[in-house]
Amino acid sequence: TTADLIEESVQTEDSSNTSEKSTDTDTSTTTTTSDTVSSATSSTSDTTETSSSSETSNQSSTSSTSEASSSETAATTNNETSETATTTTDERSGTSTSSTEATTSETASVLTNNASDTTSETTTESSSDDSESTTTTITFNGTTVVTSNSSTVTVDGTTVTINQSGSYTLTGNGSSYTIIVAGSVTDPVTIYLDGVTLTDSSITSNSSAELTVNVLSDSSISSTSANAIEAAGALTITSGTGSSLTLSSTEKHAIKADSVTVDSVTLDLTSEAKDGINATTAVTIKNATVNITATDDGIQVEDETDVNSGDLTITDSTVTINATDKGITVTDELTIEGNSKVTVVAGDEGLEGRYINLTGGTVDITAGDDGINATEWTTKDSADTSSLTNSTSDLENEVAINIDGATVTILADGDGIDSNGNVTVKSGSLYVAQTSADNATIDYDGTGIISGGTVWAIGN
């Protein structure tokens, strides 16, 4: 009948509307879930960029926020869906209530699962970030030492051994400790010094991997039997805070390594028996302040196996040396550049190397022998060449002294300048006073050229 057809049409329309509302609810759920995941992703990204000290706290907060947001979204969606169901029921008595309730249940289930997934992802990423940025703390308390990670650091009496690459922070005070980086470590190690004071102690890396010592706050290490800091490979000493590090040894060098880089830090070095800095291949000092008192050489860079190795470069730094033997001695090139200030008081030569290149800053030398000495390749103690991997015929640098921009002042008991090769002054200033009768103010075996600058030579 016509009434039956009308009733059937109304039921069909109500069913269609219910389907549309279910679709809308699912779409809303999808959008809400997407927003939740996006929020979690953004939170995770922000968390990754924070410092390591607050990573765990921030990430936990992110996880909690994500969960709370998801719960609130689920509750809101449930309420809105419930209200929609009620309105639909009131307006159209033929609508199936059970269909709306099923849709609501599915929506809540989807949101709950997505919130759980988001929390799981955030927690997993948090654990990964923490693992990558972990710093093991080694705390010295007088006669005891405590480490925050016994799997990477072992303590045997007064011997502390670092067994894995990574970052380690030393704090506290102690005496008679030996900190060792095991030779089995193949990747770089960073040791942070945070106000640590160690007496009769040393840091030694037996690994060929790079060792970085980062001074967080003023620290000191003194040794009575070893090099205060020694590295079999490359050693870098730096500070992002402008802090100072005091190193001393009564029996050996203050610092010994294959190569040494001193960057943006203040170093006070004392050796009562040997050198302030002793390196094999190279020493680089930049943006730093270095004070050295040494019974032997202030800085020695000598490679007995390679005639083109053994270099020193000082850039934009203040270096003060008081040495019983030589101030600075290298087997290859010695360069002072930028806005550097180098002051040397030496019992023997002030500066010594094969090629001495002074292009910036000021250099003040007081020497018991030659002020500046450019010499043929030999080692300090011997001219034996049996261990060379190349030969003296492979020399790349000429034997020479080049002054081009620096201001150099010399007071010497020997020769003011002594070059077994050439002497060239292109710009800058050279002031030389020489006191002994048997030597010269400027002595060279090759060619002497003054093409610019100012030269004063007073003496023989």
Describe the role of every protein-language-model region.
Residues 63:
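Alpha-helical and His/Cys-centered functional microenvironments
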Residues 1-37, 46-49, 55-59, 68-72, ...:
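A composition-driven surface/loop motif
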